[in-house]
């Protein structure tokens, strides 16, 4: 009896030891990314397949992310998802490490059209595209009939929208829109071109704009307070009931283009789980997984060439309207030119 009990205790101790060892060996991937940007079901599927734990910490801006990483947070995370203008800065500061191309087997699924728009790291040595998008224009068709207005950034000069129009509180976006309307690069540093953009905003657009806002414009549009707004489609569509989308919202990006953003997955130089981070990039770009991300936000398929066939929901807008958009680049010290223009606009 004692022998049996002793054997049982030894077996129990062995099981406990193996369980503890298993827990100790379970890897943890620490992902620092945008708020609500990673589908929970995809994360859980990754955890199950790779026997790991994913800890997601969220940020609301590139500036927040960068400041945290630059001020002692680099060792706290494995991966980040910065905009490409910040990728440029992080590469200069030696914050990122190269991606193991042998593990990133889904590289061939990244759209060449998208790669051509990359202004930084087109070879994808340090960054894997996650999402490409742009702000656009939303018109409330209940207030102004569709087809009865200019489908251009200069729609903000239309006095019918006076007191019911808003633009984002973002100087690269607003000034970039004016530059695109004039036919210039959204990242120009030419003083003459910037002066022309400033004049358009001051003289033509500003008289009709009730506020600059990057947070509540979706709610204001849904309430009917705004008839015209510049912003991200998901912020408006997310506030208007889906059954009212077609009759209420006309979202478009003008043919003259405008500023766009490209956010990419990157591995930090201090990462403790480099291979696992690379596997996560590869996992996200399995077409069926990437389609879940797109469906979750009703985004169009622009980055991954095969994901569209797995999508189950109609996107808010067609991917083709992004073709004319230009990715913003880091302007370094020349950013002050934009900031000074913006100060003058905001004062008025």
What does each model-identified segment do?
Residues 86-89, 228-246:
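A ligand-binding cleft/hinge motif common to bilobed small-molecule-binding domains
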Residues 76-77, 82-208, 215-222:
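Extracytoplasmic ligand-binding site segments that recognize negatively charged/polar headgroups
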Residues 263, 268-325:
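Mature extracytoplasmic/periplasmic domains
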Residues 23-90, 219:
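Early extracytoplasmic/lumenal segment of secretory-pathway proteins
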Residues 194-204, 245-269:
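Periplasmic-binding protein-like
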Residues 1-29:
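Short, low-complexity disordered leader/linker segments with a strong preference
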Residues 59, 82, 167, 212, ...:
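Short beta-strand and adjacent tight-turn residues that come in two discontinuous sequence segments
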Residues 310-348:
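Extracellular/periplasmic bilobal clamshell ligand-binding domains
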